[in-house]
Amino acid sequence: MKRIFSLLFMGFSLTVAAEQITMDLTTATDMVANPITYSTNYGIGFYDGTDVWDSTYNDSGVCQFIYTNEARFMLSHLPSQFSYGAQSWEGFTLSKVSQDTANVFGCVSNGGLAGVGTPYVIGYFSDWVTSSQGYSSNIILFDQEYYPDYVYICQNSNTMKAISEGGVYNARPFNENDTLALIISAIDETYTETTSLIYYLAVDGEKNNGWVKVALNTLGKTIGLSFRMTTTDVGQFGMNTPLYFALDGLTVNTNPVTNSLSPIPDSQSPIANTQKLLRNGQLFLLRDGVCYTMMGSIVNYEF
């Protein structure tokens, strides 16, 4: 009887030990536990870094990841020494920019989920880095395998200007046939993408204009997440649209989760009239029986 009681107690302990973990940016540090601090006067124009992590361009090796929640979440960050060219960065950084002025470090909500001027994550996807290293420039690793539950996504200020007005380098304004897609994938220990889903920051003439909750439960148990972006505005030298996005409130569970998607007041998620299909890692658009690549070319593809 004592042995049976012990086994029952152990089973109860395993049941109550289920845990939900939400990324807490107030706990953010570099790789040697230095707290994240924000610059007060830094940069100009689109690259104004005021209220941005002051080591965004730091070449030090301790800045290759941003840790939160005592290193339960690890966000990739490539400073200029490791990224494309000098004085640049890719991956993720942290921001508290609170003015929507086409700044690459801003978002259209002017702050994180906690309100105006509160911290949020800025992602900058580099197709060049991704192609060079064989996996995305934007990786969030976990300290163990979890079941992703949801994440909040918001349009970046610079990207919004580009797709709304053009005039940001070679970017042109979007029309109703354009799309800007964020591909979120579960990854294995080699950073290989295993399962994916797509959230559209712009589609069918609609644009993300605030924090939107994106369900991740279909990705299944994973050691981390990969983020990639694609756009239909492509030129001679690659994608023209600035590939930035904002992220907050990433939540994972130790146990499997069901769909936890719920509406958010004053936030609109673009609703597509076009069917989007992901096949063998490539995104296609199916409109009126015609199949298009993300570059706008018509292709013959059996679905």
Residue locations for each model-derived region?
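Terminal, low-complexity interaction segments
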Residues: 23-29, 176-257
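Sec-dependent N-terminal signal peptides
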Residues: 3-15
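Residue-level detector of functionally pivotal "anchor" positions at catalytic/ligand-binding pockets or at interdomain
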Residues: 254-286, 298-299
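Short coil-to-beta strand junction motifs in C2/discoidin
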Residues: 162-182
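Short, glycine-anchored, charge-dense loop/turn motifs used at functional sites
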Residues: 291-297
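N-terminal targeting leaders for non-cytosolic proteins
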Residues: 20-135, 143
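Boundary of Sec targeting at the N-terminus
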Residues: 18-20, 297
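Extended extracellular/luminal ectodomain segments enriched in beta-structured repeat modules
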Residues: 143-150, 221-222
